[in-house]
């Protein structure tokens, strides 16, 4: 009788584990779908605005320049304190479009708008030294099989003089960034914002798209990537890291999968325990009977 009751409790526990897993999975999935739809609506707005800005332009470099120029003139430059659900994730690109922001906020908007029209772009963080903290953020975007840097806080790009533009790797270890600042300061009025730009904002010696030294996880990822022949320093910063809605939607999708599989595995584990208990009891009873007969 005790064995039957124990098996019954284990059976119901397994059933509840599965149901709890499915319920958690269903809730997470619904939230993920809602977030994805909200992100998609934002994406439509960004794409429409970016297409309007670049309507008559024929090259990606011209489109990148135009979007950067538009974001520079859109709203103010104070840090955007808005956020979506989690303050640590910062504002969404739409929130930056509505209220402006600092270098990281406006760079987030530029990258999102460029990605929405099919131009690969990502944020790049600038540091004054190898072990120093990050002091500025810009955007690096791909154009005609090359890359170019744009800065939506100072409205800067870095032309080569022959129709091309410079990317992070082209600017690193050179004085081209500082030379470009001096050039623009002479071209623009003395009252222009660029008159107050810190020199370090245009130095790319320690600029990175990802802080690969952040922790053991990122360091391991770098090791694995290099082991497989990849060069992480050439990767664009993942888009989901700069879009809170997209990041949360993906995280909830992962939770959905884990909850569904986890509940099912717990039920299987409890059933396995149920199958083991009768065998042990049978063996124990057989030993007792053998001893009695003896």
Model-derived regions: residue spans:
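Extracytoplasmic/lumenal ectodomains and periplasmic regions of secretory and membrane proteins
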Residues: 156-158, 162-234
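Membrane-proximal basic amphipathic "stem/tether" segments
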Residues: 2-17, 216-249, 277
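C-terminal single-pass membrane-anchor helix
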Residues: 21-34, 233-294
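Soluble catalytic regions of membrane-associated enzymes that act on cell-envelope
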Residues: 104
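Linear, non-domain "peripheral" regions
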Residues: 1-53, 293
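Hydrophobic/aromatic-rich core segments of domains that either
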Residues: 108-182
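Short flexible/disordered coil segments
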Residues: 2-11, 19-22, 139, 143-147, ...
């Amino acid at each position: 009788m005790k064995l039957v009751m124990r098996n019954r409790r284990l059976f119901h526990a397994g059933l509840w584990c599965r149901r709890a897993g499915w319920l958690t999975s269903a809730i997470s999935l619904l939230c993920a779908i809602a977030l994805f739809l909200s992100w998609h609506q934002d994406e439509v707005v960004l794409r429409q605005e970016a297409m309007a800005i670049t309507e008559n332009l024929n090259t990606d470099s011209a489109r990148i320049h135009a979007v950067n120029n538009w974001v520079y003139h859109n709203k103010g430059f104070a840090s955007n304190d808005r956020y979506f659900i989690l303050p640590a994730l910062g504002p969404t690109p739409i929130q930056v479009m509505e209220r402006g922001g600092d270098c990281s906020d406006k760079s987030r908007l530029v990258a999102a708008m460029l990605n929405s029209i099919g131009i690969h772009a990502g944020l790049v963080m600038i540091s004054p030294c190898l072990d120093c903290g990050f002091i500025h953020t810009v955007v690096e975007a791909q154009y005609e099989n090359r890359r170019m840097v744009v800065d939506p806080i100072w409205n800067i790009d870095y032309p080569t003089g022959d129709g091309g533009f410079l990317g992070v790797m082209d600017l690193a270890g050179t004085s081209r960034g500082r030379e470009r600042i001096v050039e623009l300061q002479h071209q623009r009025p003395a009252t222009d914002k660029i008159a107050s730009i810190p020199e370090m904002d245009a130095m790319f010696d320690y600029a990175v798209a990802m802080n690969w030294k952040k922790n053991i996880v990122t360091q391991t990822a770098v090791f694995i990537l290099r082991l497989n022949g990849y060069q992480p320093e050439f990767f664009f910063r993942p888009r989901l890291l700069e879009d809170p809605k997209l990041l949360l939607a993906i995280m909830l999708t992962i939770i959905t999968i884990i909850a569904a599989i986890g509940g099912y595995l717990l039920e299987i584990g409890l059933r396995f325990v149920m199958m083991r208990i009768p065998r042990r009891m049978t063996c124990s009873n057989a030993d007792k009977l053998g001893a009695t007969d003896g």
